[in-house]
């Protein structure tokens, strides 16, 4: 029985399986769980794991020529020569890995340790994540499949095979979302006097109030379209709420009418809160917009009988396709493309669970979709907008305990930040430490008569950003302000176009980066005249210059007066604005030029050190790992004995736990109150450890199609801090999930141990 790659299946288990008539992976894949439970020493968890892994192996071996596991030596150069590490077997599918991440987010909605309204928020986030999955990843796969593309990813699955694989997984996730809503969240909320009322639950006075609301707030806005040759099926906006209405009777012109479409404008709230006079004291009563429309839609069709109506929502391809080599003005070209996003190719359709088959078939036909792209839902078709109630409910006991982010001494509004940074570099850890010092630095730069220039990159910064206000203020004060605005930040394009225009009108020099490359690095450079010299002050970060997300995402930011580092950043800005070549950088590693090769060399150095018996260890904390060459380098390092710890929030295509290949690699994902967003790289380097922070994940796009910045952390206090933080994340036994060989994740459980939750420890340690 070739089960060597199945974690937990050794020679003894193989012999026992053979005694029970299971001699091959195929037979194990087809085994019934009850059959395995009869085997001594095999519990439910192990049985499920063995069957799942066997099924995966059977599927993979039909697609790729997997090297026989029996021929793989445990370690050494000969092993590397005989193993084809480019085989698809060694890579987890990227799309399936992303769906696994969304499953982990959804699990937070079921975690009883999390406050109830935060659990509701996690449910909504999982829905929003699924929307983006379909708009981008699934849409891209569908497009490639329809074009007949056969080029496989690192896992050797073609677009067609990947689509088939994600179909069942995605349907299961959506079904679980609505099960949690209806069977878990709504009953728990009702027990806390927070109710989402169905039409059958409305009292007489509530119904009167809602009818008046419909007549005054909705009726004048809604515009139903009766379907006939003169009124064809309308264009449906991406992710909009729509109703298909079944009618009987004749319209005002005496014609038979049987179907109509009603689109709910996005300006309308999806949830309406009943006034306090219509609820009992201390209660919160909400009604879905769809319920109100369902109840009173007849008022839109006088003289025609409304037989029924069913909500539906279409998700479309939201990628924008620009031939950047052929356009003269990127901003204007993007403006022209933005409107088309609402009408991209259809990817999926969600319909009410009770929608009849004939109407479903009609809708599928209108959008050119198949049954595989159909998702029946028992509830509102857009769960993500349920989060609107969060701010309407004044129940601190059902939310996370608020905290006050702190600032290191010398960085407050009453201090001269330049003098503070001149004395020492400062590492900020958001959201535990405030983002305010970064904003204050730009403000002081605008007011300081010795500051002559400010250069900054902006990828996402949000509406009404104090960063932007500070830059505008500096420009008005006569400073030379240059801003590299990345117009192509997905789903923020419109905001960034508006931002760029506003900055230009104020006299800021605005550039849009490099054609073909997104500017994703987070860089701020301030040039200050001190005596006869210009001095550099820099800020480099792992996250965006976005004050709102700085309160929700974990990120690091470095404030430094290191002149070599500042000169590196200056050169990068010259490269971005003038398109000219620059000399070799001193300390900064930059994608798409030096970062990928530098990482490969550092991993190879650890591999060599392990073979020489020297201390060798790698810790990588990123959002995603999918770049094949980096994964292969990590495999080779593991085979040489390097201990590798990966803290990867989302996608991870590396397959850990393969005997002789990746058994020295552990992959964990931490999902908690804050979105883990920081990128940190650690290399043991034979006892001379190196730490880096960066804007780049281990993805092909970050290495080759984006401008990224990776910067060293050198001062001992900051090095010690990063070491302690990484150690804490590796000890987390509460919010951490461990990646299994088969691509699934198992949550850590502190059995008999003290609970260690990294984010909570950092909150207690760093905040007020």
Q: Could you say what each language-model-derived stretch is?
A:
Residues 65-618, 636, 640, 652-768:
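N-terminal localization/anchoring segments of enzymes in phospholipid and broader phosphate metabolism
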Residues 1-68:
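Compact, charge-rich alpha-helical regulatory domains located at protein termini
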Residues 628-631, 635:
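Glycine/threonine-rich ATP-lid/beta-loop region of ATP-binding domains
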